[in-house]
Amino acid sequence: MLRTSLRSVRALGSRPSAAVAGRQWQATVVRRAAVSGQRFFADDKKPVVPEPSQPAVLPASETLTSPSTPPPASPQVEPTSTVPPETTPLTPPTPEATVIPPVAEEPVVPPTLPTPRKKKGFFRRLRNFFLSLTILGAIAFGGGVYYSRINDAFHDFFTEYIPYGEQAVLYLEELDFKKRFPDVVSRVTGRPRDSGEQVKVPAQSGASWRVASGGEPAGRQSSSIKKAGAAAQDAVPKSEPAVVAAAKEDTAELPKTEATTTATPAEPAPAPAATDASGTPVKKPFKAPEVDEPSRWPPASPIDPLTVNGATDPIVQDLVKMLNDVITVINHDNANEKYAPTICKAKNELSKVADKINEMKAKVEADAAKQVKARVDGFDKAANELVSRVESAMAAQEAAWRREFEEEITRLKKSYDEKVHLIQDREHQIAEEKLNNRLLEQAIQLQRQFTENIKKHVEQERDGRLGKLNELHKAVAELERLTSGLNEVVDTNLRTQQLHVAVDAVRASLEDAHHPRPFIKELVALKEIAADDPVVDAAIASINPTAYQRGIPTTAELIDRFRRVATEVRKASLLPEDAGVASHASSYVLSKLMFKKEGLAAGDDVESILTRTQTYLEEGDLDNAAREMNGLKGWAKTLSRDWLGEVRKVLEVQQALDVIQAEARLQSLRVE
């Protein structure tokens, strides 16, 4: 073929002529034969073209001196050697010893085709699948954790149904809290907690007002004074807690006795003996110094405890008790001379405070008495007005009933007269046709019946009038009884009216809201107005807390959300319980081919239930719509579970409001 010849010529022409001339003729012939023996396949099949009359001109072997290029020599004809025998190189090795294989044994090399793509192995595809699934799962889990911190509804779903979702969300929230408040943990752990235990400080702790003795006194009495002082110092610290405790007990009982007794001046206690039963040393009475002794000031008298007349207020009693405890401690420490002015000032101020409190109480009681008297006078005036109105209404009603009775008697008499005349005329006409005797007997019989009827009706009207008078008497007695309990009736009517208004306020809040809005304030007001009514409390307790904390959707929102839920339920209407990916795909495709029903379609299939539910929703019947959706099973019920929960919240709120309104009506009927 033409392409084969061109390739062979190119292969030969690609080498330099000097290298070709330097080789032996046999090697050249072998190479040419090998090149010409190779076959190549064309990419496209070409039609067979007849050989040209002139040989093809090769550009590689074309020269400028010759007009044409001679054709290549045939591989079968060996050219005549122009090299002299003397310069002929040595004979090369035989073809069997050469490395080049023989031309006849070389296989035909097919053309190089594009290598087909190697098919991936099963384990490699499985590895890629699990790797992709792991990456997508991690991305989805991270996105769910992030979105659950933004949306509360998705937070509840994610933490409840996704494994380890709650732990991840809590961990991120804890990190966020630590980042925002880094010093909270250190402050909580570093500061000691208040355990609530009371810390008591002894009365003799700290510095004292006494001046410490600087050294031993000089004189003959130094040894005896030293021994007596040492004995007193050893005995006082041991006996002080008992004395202070006894003093506190005495002052604790003081306000109780002072509240019932009049103020009496405190008498000084008699001087105790040198030592009591427990061995506690008691101070000796003051003795005037002798002539040869230095002068001494007598000790100050102890401070009297505080007594307040009419101290019935607990706060004043506590203040008196505290001040008496302080006075007892000061007297025990012999500091009465130092703190006497301050204690006297505190006594005066406390007495003034008690007097002011008593004056304020008296003023408040007087104002309250005036208000109560004004309220009682107002209620009496309203009761008298109501009685007068009731009496006038009763008189007007009695006159109206008497007038109606007389009119009714006249009308009955007239009607019966007309009836009698008509019967007489008919009897007269019949008498003309029949015998006179039969006509007379019939006339007598008719007159007798007429008389009996008249008497009967008269007696009935008389009994009816007496019965109405008895009923009127009973009504008057009932009005008198109601007038006596007017205060209770007014309060009950007011509370019932307020309960109606509160229920209407809750309904108006729910109906006017264009989106879910909390109604906690309305429920709190309704519960306060009910005043511990068990029925109202039970109705409010039956409402889901999320309903009045976040609000409930309106009917339009429920219908809009039902349309979206119905679309998803129709896609999963043909799914079995253990459906796979193929079942989901087939159910999605088949749901597009199903015909939609209208109205109250019969049947228990998903499409019929959805059609009936939509019809009930358009009619405003949420109860039947929820019952229809509750009848779904499998994936359809799972997809509609959230919508059913919202409808249940709305129905619970409506049912609770209906119960409260019925209770209010029942209270109104009881009052009536």
Swiss-Prot record:
Mitochondrial intermembrane side: 149-672
Segments passing through the bilayer: 126-148
Region of interest (Disordered), residue spans: 43-112, 189-305
Biased composition (Pro residues): 86-95
One cellular-component annotation, GO: MICOS complex
Membrane topology, record value: Single-pass membrane protein
Annotated Basic and acidic residues bias: 247-256
UniProt signal peptide: none
PANTHER family: MICOS COMPLEX SUBUNIT MIC60 (PTHR15415:SF7), MITOFILIN (PTHR15415)
Binding partners and assembly: Component of the mitochondrial contact site and cristae organizing system (MICOS) complex.
Name of the molecule in the record: MICOS complex subunit mic60
Species in which this protein is naturally found: Neurospora crassa (strain ATCC 24698 / 74-OR23-1A / CBS 708.71 / DSM 1257 / FGSC 987)
